[in-house]
Amino acid sequence: MVKFAHVVAFLLLASLFQPLTARDLEINVLQLDVSQSGCPGVTKERWPELLGTPAKFAMQIIQKENPKLTNVQTVLNGTPVTEDLRCNRVRLFVNVLDFVVQTPQVG
């Protein structure tokens, strides 16, 4: 009977668990305005149409549309990243299923 009570208590606690993300904590995420950043040769800076797509597909589209972007990175959403601006980099923030969850942009 004690084991059953432990299992019930565990299930109740597990049902209340919520993963911690920046949005849940209401942390302001820095959005860089690359239109005024002075990145020469960058023809497209944002890809809102890639939200919800697989990361490999998004990476191919970005590199096809803008060959100067040589550093396309896949980053798990919520992972801390540097805030420096790089004109050859796009970060793809993905979930655990490897789908894009934030609008990819140069920076």
UniProtKB/Swiss-Prot annotation:
Major localization class: secreted
Family, as annotated:
Belongs to the protease inhibitor I13 (potato type I serine protease inhibitor) family.
- SUPFAM superfamilies attached to this UniProt entry: CI-2 family of serine protease inhibitors
Question: GO biological process annotations for this chain's record?
Answer: response to wounding
Q: Which domain of life is it from?
A: Eukaryota
Note one Pfam family from the annotation. potato_inhibit
Its name, as the record gives it, is Proteinase inhibitor I-B
Residues marked Reactive bond (site): 83-84
Alphabetically sorted, this entry's keywords are: Protease inhibitor, Secreted, Serine protease inhibitor, Signal
Q: Which organism is it from?
A: Nicotiana tabacum
Briefly describe its induction: By tobacco mosaic virus infection, wounding, UV light, salicylic acid and ethylene.
Which GO molecular function terms does the record list?
Answer: serine-type endopeptidase inhibitor activity
Q: Where in the cell is it found?
A: Secreted
Propeptide residues per the UniProt entry: 23-39
| PROSITE patterns (alphabetical) | POTATO_INHIBITOR
Q: Which residues form the signal peptide?
A: 1-22
Identify the GO cellular component terms for this protein.
extracellular region
